[in-house]
Amino acid sequence: MIYTDFKGEKISQLGFGTMRLPVINGVDKDIDEEKALEMFDYAYKHGINYFDTAWGYHEGNSEIVVGKALSRYPRESFHLTTKFPGYDRNNFPKVKEIFAKQLEKLQTEYFDFYLFHNVCEYNIENYLNPEFGVKEYLVSEREAGRIKHLGFSDHSGIECFKRFLDAYGDVIEFCQIQLNWLDWDFQEAKEKVRNL
């Protein structure tokens, strides 16, 4: 496995994403746990130490299965990523409740990486609304040690991307964007990389 250094942490360059785990009878929420656990074991034994999930993957069940799978390994041996579900504007008033539930579902006391999920034109006003206090709350969780690194995932146009960075750039350590190595114009990836 090839690893990279991120702020003193050894991260596998190949990560394990859990948006599309094996399912039973084609039903997205019904994860085939036996097959999923085999996949986690294979990845872990072959050096993958970066695991990515999110609140909404598999209708909320991805985090549960990821928690079961990773609880079998020493916590310091892997890097766990999940995300605040900003794709649903109804979640903004519930940031504390959601964060606590994610810790429970993932059977962990902290997240190595935590993202503001799917920043886009649809939800940017909620991310920028001080009434919700999402930024302040998640920064406080980082200060308390329950988040090591705070970032965001983006599916917006460049103007929305810049607005988010203007407001959150002082606390952001990393970003996930849609990047197609053969088509750098997809979702304005080239321009986003320039702005990071």
What are the language-model segments listed below?
Residues 1, 40, 63, 67, ...:
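Generic structural signal for well-ordered alpha-helices
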Residues 1-78, 137, 143:
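N-terminal binding-site loop/beta-alpha segment at the start of enzyme catalytic domains
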Residues 3, 11-15, 49-50, 77-83, ...:
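Structural preference for beta-strand elements that scaffold enzyme active sites
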Residues 19-21, 54-56, 83-87, 116-119, ...:
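Active-site beta-loop-alpha junctions enriched in small/polar residues
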Residues 20-34, 83-93, 122-127, 156:
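Active-site mouth loops of central-metabolism enzymes
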Residues 28-43, 91-107, 156-166:
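Short, acidic/polar
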Residues 104-126:
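Active-site groove signature of glycoside hydrolases
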Residues 119-196:
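Beta/alpha (TIM)-barrel catalytic core signal, keyed to glycine-rich beta->alpha loops juxtaposed to Asp/Glu
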